[in-house]
Curated annotation (Swiss-Prot):
Residues 1-40, 549-602 are cytoplasmic. It comes from the Eukaryota. The lineage of its organism: Eukaryota, Metazoa, Chordata, Craniata, Vertebrata. The gene is Slc6a13. The modification Phosphothreonine is found at T587. It comes from Rattus norvegicus (Rat). The keyword Membrane applies. Disulfide bonds join C153-C162. This is Sodium- and chloride-dependent GABA transporter 2. One of its GO terms (molecular function) is amino acid binding.
């Protein structure tokens, strides 16, 4: 390859142009990268937060929890928890210029455990979330055929109980207690070859292993050059799913029965608001869909320029995320309404959530459409892209945290690429257990416990307490004003102080009280050691916060008061805005806000 650089001509003279090279610090480490432009940041965050949950979880929760009435608790959680915590994490990354662990070390060392907790959650998420991509790739490849393999009962994996419901005359009672559909048999007997329990893992499903390997290879090359590659990839992965969603929406609303499905999706049932479970579902959906408490927003925000208007970006992204969930509901329930009418069954019998929607309900609907392979390809390609950018941003979050913890080790030429490769290979091999014949039971354990709403709520409580009551809400607002040039809406500050921790704590306690052991398909009950393993996965993140605080208090020398003072003071190298003296008389509220900084004189 010719590495010579052409020159420029000025007044007849040729001047050499230096090649663009990575900047190197005095200690030999590479300078920390930044986004090339704002659009790369916006699309990266959009790709992370707009994922599978918008398509397969939010619409079902609306239907299940009172239709349009569900928007009341959802919007309350959005404005008291979703936007405030989303903004807090993004602004924290931009202000400290650090990843998900060292950002917390910078502003409050005693709560560095928040960073470890979020990275533990994201590490577990990296292992199991990508398995969904492996399933989606398998379905995508299976869709390149004239007759979809889940459309009939004539394959070797089908049983004598298989009934093609979509071709059955509804007036005839051909179903039996053991009847099943070709879609379910394709999912359970062809894709998963599912065993009878977690105690029987069986052999690896090698076709899925190859799909998982392909997913990890794609993920690796999306982020291997840091934000330089990530920022370019998201132009496609974050925008193309919208095109697919619009196509599926137009097709869905033009089908017979679509209006019935949309009515079930939106018809308000106000009485459901008296059920605490509805409020818990709204809260956990906000945390799931906004990627809160995973360290991802902090990592992405850390690559912003210091004076980027992150407040405006965050509000716009939150509204975009919720709007996408709302629109996706029309696309999904118009199809479910069509299925309900075609099969002559109530919509409750075809409505699914989670993997059941993506790999059972929607494939069943696609079979009934003209040119079904085309619509199957569109849908599963959308699923792959929705999951892909969420996946590689989560990996980026973990890698950013590790690089910022050990910059002299990893912030050198090719070291980062090697680190990403190690993370990918280790996660790939751990994830293989979920591609065995009993792997679905392991996947459900990870999904139910490892990255559950309970874990995210626990971390969110300490995030708001740390920033608002230890570091100081007013101090952080001053830092934000220094970055963006003005102070955000005051309600966000009071959410950090009061509403967010209170709402998160109440929802967390309710989730503990209402806890029910995990089951699969409402039939299979996990053995006691399965639930014990699940709780270990959940506690592996939550224990990080108190454990780190105790560890730091015990290892520091000196009187307890002095140790506490050291552990609550922010790093001296953080940008600080000069504080003008207060000339107005103190009010109870201003006195309270000054107390939030613990009078540490930091």
């Amino acid at each position: 390859m010719d590495n010579r650089v052409s020159g420029t001509t000025s007044n007849g003279e040729t001047k050499p142009v230096c090649p663009v090279m990575e900047k190197v610090e005095e200690d030999g480490t590479l300078e920390r990268e930044q986004w090339t432009n704002k659009m790369e940041f916006v699309l990266s965050v959009a790709g992370e937060i707009i994922g599978l949950g918008n398509v397969w979880r939010f619409p079902y929760l609306c239907y299940k929890n009172g239709g349009g009435a569900f928007f009341i608790p959802y919007l309350i959680f959005l404005f008291t928890c979703g936007i405030p915590v989303f903004f807090l994490e993004t602004a924290l990354g931009q202000y400290t210029n650090q990843g998900g662990i060292t950002a917390w070390r910078k502003i409050c060392p005693i709560f560095e455990g928040i960073g470890y907790a979020s990275q533990m959650i994201v590490s577990l998420l990296n292992v199991y979330y990508i398995v969904v991509l492996a399933w989606a790739l398998f379905y995508l490849f299976s869709s390149f055929t004239t007759d979809l393999p889940w459309g009939s009962c004539s394959h070797e994996w089908n049983t004598e109980n298989c009934v093609e419901f979509q071709k059955t005359n509804n007036s005839l009672n051909v179903t039996s207690e053991n009847a099943t559909s070709p879609v379910i048999e394709f999912w359970e007997r062809r894709v998963l070859k599912i065993s009878d329990g977690i105690q029987h893992l069986g052999s690896l499903r090698w076709e899925l292993v190859l799909c998982l390997l392909l997913a990890w290879i794609i993920c690796y090359f999306c982020i291997w050059k840091g934000v330089k590659s990530t920022g370019k990839v998201v132009y496609f992965t974050a925008t193309f799913p919208y095109l697919m969603l619009v196509v599926l929406l137009i097709r869905g609303v033009t089908l017979p029965g679509a209006a019935q499905g949309i009515q079930f999706y939106l018809y308000p049932n106000i009485t459901r608001l008296w059920d605490p479970q509805v409020w818990m579902d709204a809260g956990t959906q906000i945390f799931f869909s906004f990627a809160i408490c995973l360290g991802c927003l902090t990592a992405l925000g850390s690559y912003n320029k210091y004076h980027n208007n992150c407040y405006r970006d965050c509000v716009a992204l939150c509204i975009l995320n919720s709007s996408t969930s709302f629109v996706a509901g029309f696309a999904i329930f118009s199809i479910l309404g069509f299925m309900s009418q075609e099969q002559g069954v109530p919509i409750s019998e075809v409505a699914e959530s989670g993997p059941g929607l993506a790999f059972i309900a929607y494939p069943r609907a696609v079979v009934m459409l003209p040119f079904s392979p085309l619509w199957a390809c569109c849908f599963f390609f959308m699923v792959v892209l929705l999951g892909l950018d969420s996946q590689f941003v989560c990996v980026e979050s973990l890698v950013t945290a590790l690089v910022d913890m050990y910059p002299r080790v990893f912030r050198k030429k090719n070291r980062r690429e090697i680190l990403i490769l190690i993370v990918s290979v280790v996660s790939f091999f751990i994830g293989l257990i979920m591609l065995t014949e009993g792997g679905m039971y392991v996947f459900q354990l990870f999904d139910y416990y490892a990255a559950s709403g309970m874990c995210l709520l626990f971390v969110a409580i300490f995030e708001s307490l740390c920033v608002a009551w230890v570091y100081g809400a007013s101090r952080f607002y001053d830092n934000i004003e220094d970055m963006i040039g003005y102070k955000p809406w005051p309600l966000i500050k009071y959410c950090w102080l009061f509403f967010t921790p209170a709402v998160c704590l109440a929802t967390f306690l309710f989730s503990l009280i209402k806890y029910t052991p995990l089951t699969y398909n409402k039939k299979y009950t996990y053995p006691w050691w399965g639930d014990a393993l699940g709780w270990l996965l959940a506690l592996s993140s939550m224990v990080c916060i108190p454990a780190w605080s105790i560890y730091k208090l015990r290892t520091l020398k000196g009187p307890l008061r002095e140790r506490l003072r050291q552990l609550v003071c922010p790093a001296e190298d953080l940008p600080q805005k000069s504080q003008p003296e207060l000339t107005s008389p103190a009010t109870p509220m201003t006195s309270l806000l000054r107390l939030t900084e613990l009078e540490s004189n930091c």
